């Protein structure tokens, strides 16, 4: 059977930049064809190009001017559409493979500064206390304002073991924060697993790389063997998961849902952007080799699909993580606990160009099995458990020029409001250190385990 890998390669998180990340104009137009380029606008473009070439204070080469024009054309669409030069395209490929050099953060640009989208767990940036939404304003002695994202990324890269001084602005903290980070070779592990205690498994998915589904299946089988019999409960932790590959979101969903159950559907203008993705193996297995042999989800114990589950999410759970959460929630397969998710309901396609560059283009909106768009809204948990950092929450709705939610047409804006921190909280945030997930100090994790045990007690009472 033809694999969906041959049909699409979609990335739903921000680009994981390596800290994790002849011109001819047509001279005619057919008035009957609305898709032809507008001559007047092209003349204006050529005129502006000429003025920059002749009058700008510094001499700028044609390749740089045209590259910047391409960047502007993509960035003007929405926050997630970007032009990837050869270096950035290579960095993105390395990021989805799970290995890259640098600090371990997913970054973007905002107001001329480098914005921290997500610090990746167990990396130097994460351990140093960088937070989603932090704006990097200085790298060693270099001010970030005026740098391109690529230039800033190059400054942040370096030999493992060397350090860099970073100055950040943090929302609701008055003074800039100085952080020293030691660079490292980053090898991200997208799946972490442990037996919390007999009969209760903890599965943490930090992002969706090209082998996340396989790694999850291996982890489940290893824990199951260690436990010697079926689990009484599973915690699936996707907090601070920025997303990743759509195929792997389908794969993780398939581990816990029944055969051919709908995971997500997408709608866009291009024919290939209209898809209904179910848990069928052709939607996540790579092409080549023995199809049945490569079906790692089929090899899981059958009772995994019935074990009580709690999924933990927060404002850093985005895109692919929200697809999994939405599928498990809509099919009533799991109880969702934590805080409202990020709210990224769009799909980006990586489209390679002939010169070795690529564009990451928003090509579709996605919908949960029940037909809900979470764009700009996120997924509300069934049980809200805050971890004390909600005042730092940063979501899709906070990004300027983010896509609209198609289900909001004609409705007044009822965007959820995040309350700011109290003066005491502001002081505490200055010395904020990330919570170590999956430990006794993790309030949401502790509460999830209590809920699972409560489910087990109820099941026992019903049997007796």
Residue ranges of model-derived segments:
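Flexible, low-complexity junctional segments that flank or bridge functional domains
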Residues: 1-234, 240-244, 255-258, 419-464
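C-terminal "post-core" interaction segments
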Residues: 2-9, 18, 191-464
């Amino acid at each position: 059977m033809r694999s969906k890998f041959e049909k699409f390669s979609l990335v739903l998180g921000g680009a994981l930049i390596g800290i994790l990340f002849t011109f001819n104009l047509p001279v005619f137009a057919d008035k009957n064809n609305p898709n032809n380029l507008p001559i007047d606008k092209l003349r204006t473009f050529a005129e502006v190009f000429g003025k920059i070439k002749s009058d700008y204070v510094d001499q700028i080469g044609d390749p740089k001017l045209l590259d910047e024009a391409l960047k502007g054309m993509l960035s003007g669409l929405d926050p997630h559409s970007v032009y990837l030069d050869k270096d950035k395209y290579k960095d993105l490929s390395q990021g989805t493979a799970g290995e890259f050099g640098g600090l371990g953060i997913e970054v973007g640009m905002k107001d001329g500064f480098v914005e921290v989208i997500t610090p990746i767990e167990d990396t130097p940036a994460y351990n140093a206390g960088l937070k989603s939404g932090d704006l990097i304003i200085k790298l060693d002695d270099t001010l970030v304002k005026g740098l391109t994202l690529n230039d800033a990324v190059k400054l942040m890269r370096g030999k493992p073991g060397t350090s860099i001084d970073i100055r950040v602005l943090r929302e609701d903290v008055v003074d800039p924060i100085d952080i020293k980070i030691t660079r490292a070779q980053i090898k991200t592990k997208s799946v972490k697993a442990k037996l919390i205690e007999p009969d209760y498994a903890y599965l943490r998915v930090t992002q969706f790389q090209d082998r996340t589904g396989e790694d999850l299946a291996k982890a489940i089988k290893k824990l199951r063997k260690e436990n010697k019999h079926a689990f009484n409960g599973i915690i699936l932790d996707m907090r601070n998961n920025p997303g990743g590959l759509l195929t792997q979101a389908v794969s993780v969903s398939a581990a816990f849902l029944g055969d051919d159950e709908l995971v997500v559907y997408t709608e866009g203008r291009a024919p290939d952007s209209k898809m209904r993705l179910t848990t069928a193996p052709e939607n996540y297995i790579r092409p080549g080799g023995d199809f049945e042999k490569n079906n790692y989800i089929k090899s899981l114990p059958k009772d995994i699909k019935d074990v009580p589950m709690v999924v933990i999410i927060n404002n850093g759970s985005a895109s692919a993580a929200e697809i999994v959460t939405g599928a498990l929630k809509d099919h009533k397969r799991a109880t969702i606990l934590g805080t409202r998710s990020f709210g990224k309901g769009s799909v980006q396609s990586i489209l390679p160009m002939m010169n070795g560059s690529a564009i990451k283009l928003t090509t579709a909106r996605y919908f949960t099995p029940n037909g809900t768009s979470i764009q700009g809204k996120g997924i509300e948990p069934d049980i809200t458990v805050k971890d004390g950092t909600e005042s730092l929450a940063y979501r899709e709705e906070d990004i300027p020029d983010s896509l609209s939610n198609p289900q909001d047409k004609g409705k007044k804006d009822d965007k959820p409001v995040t309350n700011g921190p109290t003066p005491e909280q502001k002081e505490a945030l200055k010395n904020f250190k990330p919570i170590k997930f999956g430990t006794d100090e993790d309030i949401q994790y502790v509460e999830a385990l209590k809920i699972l045990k409560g489910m087990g007690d109820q099941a026992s009472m019903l049997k007796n």
